[in-house]
């Protein structure tokens, strides 16, 4: 109960996260009642959990599946997410918590750089699922910030430079958590197996 009681937070902190802010009109598919304020509150609660020693916090933001109405949907979700996510990172840093907290913002795949206009959907163009190039941002927790790693082709269809496989990403996370991913290897039927598979490598360029 104490954790979710925000009465001890200053007005400036609540405003920084956007707690109490109004939803945008003409909601996207992720719309509902008070979703902007609710997501802001969730980000603030994440900081409060970290302060109290919670080891893993998952903030879920839904409805980025923009197969149609891209302009409206993307503006709605980005406006909902940008302020409180930035506030969370700033707040963690101001309180001396960011160096020991790894912040990861990502999803399971990206979106196509070219438009999608499939039958049965709105006539307004959207984007389809795209596993061949997408980005994740990371902050704090041993990350060397202020850099962009990797590059796509000219249209954003394929990653072509400094590509990071998901196994490399997992190996890097484990390293940041203090685990040597190669020590998690086991042998079965003549082959080595591990969480990061045998090709996964730590992305040292990411690490401070």
Which residues fall in each region the model found?
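Ligand-binding pockets and gating/stacking loops
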Residues: 1-208
